[in-house]
Amino acid sequence: MSIIPSNIEIDFTDEQISPSAGSIFLSEMAKKMGLREELNAAIKIKKRARGSSDTEMLLSLIYSLAQGDGAILDVDRLGHDQTRCQLLGLHRVPNHRRLGEYLGRFDDNTCGRLEKVAQSQASKVIESVVEYERETKGYVPVFIDGTAIEVTGDYFEGAGKLYDGNTGYWLHAAFVGGLWVTQRFQKGGGHVAHEVKDLLKETAEMVGEGHPVWARFDNAYYRNDVAAFCRERKWDYSISVTSETFKRPLREMMSDFIEEDWEAINDDGTEHAAFLYHRPSGWKQEQVYVVVRSMYEGKQRLLYPRYTFILVSREDLPLAEIVKRHRGKQGQENVFKGPLIHLDLHHPPCGTFNANRAFYSAGQIAQILLVAVQMKLLPKEAYKHGIRTVIRDIVRVAGKLVRHARKWKLLFSKSALRLYWLSHAADCLLSSG
């Protein structure tokens, strides 16, 4: 490799070069999933055919978010990249002010319709996700959780007190594997598990019957109706029990344990587990619990053992396997953090509640598109990676658009880090027409 000389002249060109030429895979996947048609049929806000249409407004936001640009201002970056707009099939990209004003016109009905579009898009990817999870894990992990979306300032409609005293909204979401299948953006001040039954029903409809589902929940979902729903669907489940009130009767039952009651669940014998049986107040039937006794925090031995309690649906599996499956919840918690971090969805951009609600639905669709690219266009080795890798190594790859013999051609550099992934994705598009 030759050394770059120090006296390089910097100049500019009119050639069609984009730092995000990998966006073509987003637009092609959106085309295959009928996203434009669904948005066009569901969202009718604009009254005049002037400027960007409803569909172009939303697609501009979705594609901007899918690149990890979570601020409304970032849509201006998209609008100035004409090559990227051409690859995405966008004729008119709104500036950030127009887009903000447009989101402010959403009401409950249009927000609900946009949420349905997101669910419809997820239903077109979920089969691939379920197949992969069954192949690699032997079961389909489902995770439902709520997270606080904090805001600062006095101009956020519907923001209220959160569990930690801060002000903000609640975002409740359901994931199947790494796919964000459904969500509810809610006003602050409510319960973290509000509308969990609706999320469960929508998730169950998408997953379908006949799959070995393992649903995982935090303490907020330690409720009889949640466990009953899972039993009715023949889902396995595990729920963390962290409230001191709920743990008290379980601790009392442990007083009769002897050392032989504990079973080692790791190779070095630093963790043991045992089954407990208890009927919580208000529940009709006795429930099965697993208690985990940990002697170490990393490599540091604890002065006293730490006990973790988990409500479980099964006792026919080895204790080590049950604990392993429940701890996989952490991986899906990270999947939930993925859109918030990598799509930069931590900060609601609008002052009105429904505008922010629409914004997070667009964020969900962006995540679904990224997972669809990952599962349908990339090789299997890419499935284990998070969406951050897809954004950085596929979407944000520079390319040059050229026209020769009346045909358009997109050129990527052969020095791209994930060149094989790009080649595989291009071959998939070519073979599918």
Stretches found by the model and what they are:
Residues 29, 75, 263, 319-371:
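Short amphipathic alpha-helical "interface-anchor" segments enriched in bulky aromatics
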Residues 1-191, 196-208, 374, 381, ...:
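Dynamic "connector" segments at or just before major functional cores
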Residues 190-246:
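Domain-level cores of phosphate- or acyl-group-handling catalytic modules
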Residues 41-49, 318-326, 342-358, 374-386, ...:
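Short, solvent-exposed helix-loop connector elements
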Residues 2-8, 12, 236-341, 430-432:
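An anionic, glycine-rich sequence signature occurring as long contiguous blocks
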Residues 82-85, 149-151, 190, 221-225, ...:
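Flexible loop/turn segments at secondary-structure boundaries
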Residues 361-396:
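C-terminal hydrophobic structural anchor segments
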Residues 29, 60, 75, 95, ...:
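Short, conserved catalytic/metal-binding motifs centered on acidic residues
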